[in-house]
């Protein structure tokens, strides 16, 4: 899954290791969901999904590359720092994208916020008292 390793490097090389695992998990879990392409390469390079992938490839140290590979391996064996069903994230260093309003925030690791589909238990309804 070298495309996922590149994604972790481009999207989260400056983040804590646990956030790198969560970023890798997003890509790997999308492969299993019919809403996204069914290969890691297809997910990682899908248009308008991961802004870091549209950026020019930066230079990374051997240690950064090995750490990213370990993060991808950790996600492959099932480690999910934010739980299952996390398909979106963004860096909190930018303004929250509009798509976050329709999702449920599950966790924040480093400066990355991770989101899942809203579940019925996430919705709070307020009924007027008559």
Region spans (language model):
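Bacterial extracytoplasmic/cell-wall-associated proteins, especially those involved in peptidoglycan
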Residues: 1-130
